[in-house]
Amino acid sequence: DAQHFVMSGEKRFDEARIKEFASAQGLAFFDTAYRVCRLQDNASDAHLQILEPSSLAQLLAPMPQCHTIVTTGGKASEELLMQLQQHSESPVSLPAIGDCVRLQAFGRELCWWRMPSTSRAYPLSLAKKADSYRRLFP
């Protein structure tokens, strides 16, 4: 249901419902950037500069059971790719949107899913974005 997390009658997501789902599924969320600068006043990654990336190594350290990472959006995926390449035992490639790559990094096997951006600036219908997420959450 593409509208599952949308507030009824509104054009926004239901934060409480998302948190409830995340808790039940054992999901954690983080940004790939700790500090950013928007070069223009819009949601486009093209005008987003990462000033301080988040440390994936530090984020994963207290979560030894974490073996799946998901990125949404181009900038987040580019930043994660750079960190994975630095900490991987073999070359890492960018997954196709809606797909995953398996790799060894940070002393564990990881599955990295790259999903379509959830931003309204990304020109893909919510229904098509939901189709990609069905593969991640069968």
For each predicted feature, which ranges?
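C-terminal capping/extension of enzyme domains
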Residues: Q40-A57, M82-P138
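Short, well-ordered beta-to-alpha junction loops that form the rim of enzyme active sites
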Residues: T71-S77
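Short, surface-exposed acidic-centric catalytic microdomains
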Residues: D1-L48
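A generic secondary-structure signal
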Residues: Q58-P62
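Short charge-dense sequence patches
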Residues: A2-R12, S77-S88
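Short, glycine/serine-rich, charged loops/turns that create anion-binding
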Residues: Y34, A76, S119
